[in-house]
Amino acid sequence: MEFYASLKSIAMHVPSERVKNAEFQQFLDTSDEWIEKRTGIKERRFASNEEKSSDLGVIAAKQAIERAHLTPKDIDLVVVATLSPDFLAMPSTACVLSAKLGIENKPAFDISAACTGFIYLLSVAKAYVESGMCENVLIVGAEKTSSVLDFKDRGTCILFGDGAGACVIGRTKRLKESILDVQISANGNFSNYLYTPRTLKPTPFNSKEEALEPFLCMKGNEVFKLAVKTLLKDVETILEKNALKPEDVRLFIPHQANFRIIQAVREHLDFKDEQVVLTVHKYGNTSAASIPMAMCEAYEEGRLKKGDLMLLDAFGGGLTWGSALVYFGG
């Protein structure tokens, strides 16, 4: 191989509006203590009515491109992961975001892998770069999860937040600046554990109407148990496959869904506190944006430096899951 795929830059953006747990008490049977005890979340950000996922994503994307010392014209491919796209079916949020960046005549498409979206993005970008098809790939996890939440359901609406994270994936000849390994998987037999239904209206050819509201639905207890079991196995597998141990990893950056899930994986694998990046208390579950946002915070705080090895893992609707070993090449 002449070169490897490398994570060249990272950036993030969140809306300005902070929503603290206590604000949910105004319309739900809940409390700050109840939410924080069960999730570790203290607050989250919600976008305005005018903002869409692409608006959040484009701000992060511009900064990621600048940090990679590139211009939008240098980007060969744009891929967006989101469960809250700007439009229901088309155009893709990646196409909308590309236009806002001034990128024309370059491929752009979305990935639907829910909270595992960023790991899927890494897999796609790595393949495109290492095959020689692209030199610079822009990947963006952008979420306005508040647009798909039922604010009458305290089991879901308290968990999520809005935000975006973006990375530029380029080339390197150095293994220790590369995306070392990515593994992704899915099992559609559990698709009813976490999903967003679509309302079907009657037509002249079909009188049946499904009056389901298009809000995120989740079997919380089942998802929690399966997430912990699956992530433990997945992380152990990728470490063993690459002859690595937890102490070889500079930072463990898991999907920020729930502090209890993160803690269960951390304790089982014996990661030290200083190895683990946590942002769930500040932003809640930002789905496909959570890992790049957490990565960016670590970078901006000086915890993540060039050549550092990161272990990433995520679990989401589909059900989907994945993990990655990534040397920071920025």
From Swiss-Prot:
One of its GO terms (cellular component) is cytoplasm. Pathway: Lipid metabolism; fatty acid biosynthesis. This is Beta-ketoacyl-[acyl-carrier-protein] synthase III. It is an enzyme of class 2 (transferase). SUPFAM superfamilies: Thiolase-like (SSF53901). Belongs to the thiolase-like superfamily. FabH family. It catalyses: malonyl-[ACP] + acetyl-CoA + H(+) = 3-oxobutanoyl-[ACP] + CO2 + CoA. It is found in: Cytoplasm. Catalyzes the condensation reaction of fatty acid synthesis by the addition to an acyl acceptor of two carbons from malonyl-ACP. Catalyzes the first condensation reaction which initiates fatty acid synthesis and may therefore play a role in governing the total rate of fatty acid production. Possesses both acetoacetyl-ACP synthase and acetyl transacylase activities. Its substrate specificity determines the biosynthesis of branched-chain and/or straight-chain of fatty acids. Residues 256-260 are annotated as: ACP-binding. The active site is at 115, 255, 285. The keyword tRNA processing does not apply. The last Arg residue of the ACP-binding site is essential for the weak association between ACP/AcpP and FabH. The keyword Phosphoprotein does not apply. Gene3D superfamilies: 3.40.47.10. It comes from Helicobacter pylori (strain HPAG1). Its EC number is 2.3.1.180. Keywords: Acyltransferase, Cytoplasm, Fatty acid biosynthesis, Fatty acid metabolism, Lipid biosynthesis, Lipid metabolism, Multifunctional enzyme, Transferase. It comes from the Bacteria. GO terms for biological process: fatty acid biosynthetic process; secondary metabolite biosynthetic process. GO terms for molecular function: 3-oxoacyl-[acyl-carrier-protein] synthase activity; beta-ketoacyl-acyl-carrier-protein synthase III activity. It holds the Pfam family ACP_syn_III. InterPro entries: ACP_syn_III_C, ACP_syn_III_N, FabH, Thiolase-like.
